Amino acid sequence: MLPDKKLGSPNHRFHHWLVRQAIAALDNAQVSAQAIESIEKTYFDGGKIAPDSQRGVNTYNYFKSTLERELLKIKFNLARFNATNLLNNSEDFQITEAEIIVKLDAIEKIIAKYRFSEDLVEVDSQSSAEINNISPKRSNFFNIQRDLSAQDEQKILQNLRNLRLQRRIATRFLIVLIFIPLTVQILTKNLVFAPLVQHFRVDIVAWEKIHYQEETIEHYFEEFARYKETLEIKQLLSENQPLNQEKIHQELKKKAEELIRQAATNSQQGIVNLLADIAGLVAFVVLIIVFRGKSIITQQYLSQSFLALNDITKVFIFILLTDMFVGFHSAHGWEVVLENLTSHFGLPENRHAVYIFIATVPVFLDSLFKLLIFNYFTRQSPTSVAILEKMQQ
């Protein structure tokens, strides 16, 4: 028998822990599925928890939060089960593969009916196109000049429910997209990467092995020169016995070491910021991938909200955004942004690179942004294009 298969070996204990985690995740997912099934049998006659059931919308709204919470638990626990099962190459499962399949089938039987409707009640493509093409001025129901049949009224009410549901989902998802990556960035920066990089601090390295670019320590040279001049002025104006050259040399050496250590610390802090930003970006991408349905709904809602604006407002937003890239006021703004970025990542400030960036990149972004917006306006709002052309003339 191989050594890593011995009972009590670290590898065996690790695989045993993975097995227990996988079984626990699968059991938790099954418990959540059974909770949904219990609500279905008790209050919805064994059918789907939906607003169009015999119980009505009020009962559905009461159990909606419970349904969403249990579905989220199932998704999370199944992801845990798949991840631990992927990492575990051991066959030391406490339950057989047949029992796992039975549990997965039982869970799938319950959640399958909510797979495509948990985020949004689907509307047929024809009715969605009709909603998108309705002008905001004509979307007021008090201005409809025709008689509505019962079927038309039900369709309109269903569309309104879908819009309210879209707004709720989009608002929550946008809040999650903002706060979760920020939280991950802050926590990883202070709890993970900062202590890790601290092991490579500069005070354990010989000074002779430290090399910096001239741009990096130019600021510290200026600060050292000011400190030296201040020390000389204090010595000249002091009524006490002036410091000897050896004492002055010690003070200057102490200040130089402090500034070099500060420069190295700032450089290390840039590495910490870079790693933390990458962690926040990874969290953002994971949220987009895991909640792909919600991201699509949010995109559709934002697009519909923008199209619902009047043409003058659309053109104003377009001009405002394009002027942010190129304009008499934007050059200094780009300088401030680039200086903050270089300081954030601990990079040396290069004025020539900043000027080249300002002379090329904003112009390219402005042209690309105008092309995309014109293409979008031409397809979705031709009137806005006409208004914009008149304003430019």
UniProtKB/Swiss-Prot annotation:
Membrane topology recorded in Swiss-Prot or TrEMBL: Multi-pass membrane protein
TM annotation in the entry: 173-193, 271-291, 306-326, 354-374
Presence of the UniProt keyword Transmembrane in the record: yes
Summary of the knockout phenotype: Reduced H(+) influx activity following dark to light transition leading to a delayed transition from H(+) extrusion to H(+) uptake. The double mutant missing both PxcA and PxcL is impaired for light-induced H(+) extrusion and later exhibits lower H(+) uptake activity. The double mutant missing both PxcL and FlpA has both reduced light-induced H(+) extrusion and later lower H(+) uptake activity.
Principal localisation: membrane
Family stated for the protein in its record: Belongs to the CemA family. PxcL subfamily.
NCBIfam families: PRK02507.1-2 (NF002704)
Protein function: Together with PxcA, contributes to transient H(+) uptake following dark to light transition. Required for H(+) influx to activate the Calvin-Benson-Bassham cycle. May also be involved in CO(2) transport.
Name used for this protein in its record: PxcA-like protein
